[in-house]
Curated annotation (Swiss-Prot):
Residues 170-324 form the ELMO domain. It comes from Mus musculus (Mouse). One of its GO terms (cellular component) is stereocilium. One of its GO terms (biological process) is auditory receptor cell development. This is ELMO domain-containing protein 3. Its main location: other. Acts as a GTPase-activating protein (GAP) for ARL2 with low specific activity. Pfam families: ELMO_CED12. It comes from the Eukaryota.
């Protein structure tokens, strides 16, 4: 920027940050383009630190409000909004970079780098069978997991033994990321509060809803919202969970699906696919997403409500353990179609001959047996 086009100087700065004199001058070629043209190369933070924004929008040194451009006013308004946002100091989380989202891989690396030996002692990697059950499993059951993959399997089961620690910065970032991605919020929120009920937790503290799944339940939610291939699916299921009739607790349902994934892994239902891919964690993640997708389709197409949840989850677990390959194939097909913009979860898989959204040709038996509206009696916990 040349001296002929713009010049400004600051003669003296008081200790309180106010300026004794700010002088700005523009050449005639810039007067018609608005005041901000002269300062376009200066960050807004510098403008406010030196009082230049105030000088541009006040009657100082001959500057009249009438000559202030809309761009200057808009910049000032944006800065004032930013200046009024205060970090969450009550949540107990002190991140080095507040507000930064965390990826699934970064969260996983955290657990790979810390000592989990006390949690690992609690795991039971496989189901112990005896008698005829053991013989039947040996003859007709799935293959055993390859030796080289067992450490990765044990890590998954160990994470499921870990609880949520609100004082741990990584744990806090995982929660914040899930909240921001599902709600679209750009700002941090308290780790305890009623706003977590909006996401489908039972109460103000998400930690109380992780029984039987531990932190793995949160890692699965993180995977769902941070993977570009499954994020749209997560949004659609979350939207379905807020349906005025078919609403259900999104996060609580997700925790139950993580439990199903844990059981499928321990019962070696996923061993064949893990051996084929030579990986465990990606298979478990995909199995979780595929099971959630199937639940959402059943919920949508069969007009399920919270009263049906116990039966839906029971049938879902049986199907998932019996036909994991089928579920994974369905997920792959769905994601391929979504990437081409050819399908929507909320409109997918209507059976031929269906009489519309209220068709009852597909039902679970005993659906009306549940009388209570509570999550516990519905079989969600």
């Amino acid at each position: 920027m040349s001296e002929t086009s713009c010049s400004f100087f600051i003669e003296k700065e008081f200790q309180d940050g106010q300026l004794e004199n700010v002088s700005a001058g523009l050449s005639s070629s810039y007067k018609d383009k608005g005041a901000l043209m002269a300062f376009r190369g200066i960050p807004i933070s510098e403008l406010t630190n030196h009082g230049i924004l105030q000088a541009l929008t006040a009657e100082t040194n001959g500057w009249q409000p009438g000559v202030v451009s809309e761009e200057v006013l808009r910049a000032q308004e944006e800065w004032e909004v930013v200046d009024t946002i205060h970090p969450d100091i009550e949540s107990g989380v002190h991140c080095q970079q507040p507000g930064q989202l965390i990826s699934f891989n970064e969260a996983l690396e955290h657990f790979q780098s810390v000592d989990l030996s006390s949690f690992k002692k609690r795991i039971q990697p496989t189901i112990q069978r005896t008698g005829l059950a053991a013989l039947r499993h040996c003859l007709f059951g799935p293959p055993k997991l390859h030796q080289g993959l067992r450490e990765e399997r044990d890590l998954v089961l160990t994470i499921a033994q870990c609880g949520l620690d609100s004082q741990n910065p990584t744990h806090g970032r995982v929660l914040q990321t899930i909240y921001k991605k599902l709600t679209g919020s750009k700002f941090d929120c308290a780790l305890h509060g009623d706003h977590w009920e909006d996401l489908g937790f039972q109460g103000a503290n998400p930690a109380t809803d992780l029984r039987g799944a531990g932190f793995l339940a949160l890692l699965h939610l993180l995977y769902l919202v941070m993977d570009s291939k499954t994020f749209l699916m997560a949004q659609e299921i979350f939207r379905l969970s807020h349906h005025h009739i078919q609403q259900f607790p999104f996060c609580l349902m997700s925790v139950n699906i993580t439990r199903i994934a844990i059981q499928a892994l321990r019962e070696e239902c996923l061993s064949r696919e893990c051996n084929r891919r030579q990986k465990v964690i990606p298979v478990v993640n995909s199995f979780y997403a595929a099971t959630f997708l199937h639940l959402a389709r059943v919920w949508r197409t069969q007009q399920k409500t919270i009263l049906d949840s116990g039966f839906v989850l029971k049938d879902l677990e049986a199907l998932a353990k019996k036909s994991p390959k089928r579920l994974l194939k369905t997920l792959d097909d769905y994601l391929a179609q979504v990437s081409k913009g050819q399908t929507s979860l909320l409109e997918a898989h209507k059976r031929p001959g269906s009489q519309g959204p209220h068709s009852r040709d597909l039902t679970f038996t005993g659906v009306c047996d549940l009388q209570s509206h509570s999550f516990e009696s519905a079989g969600l916990i």
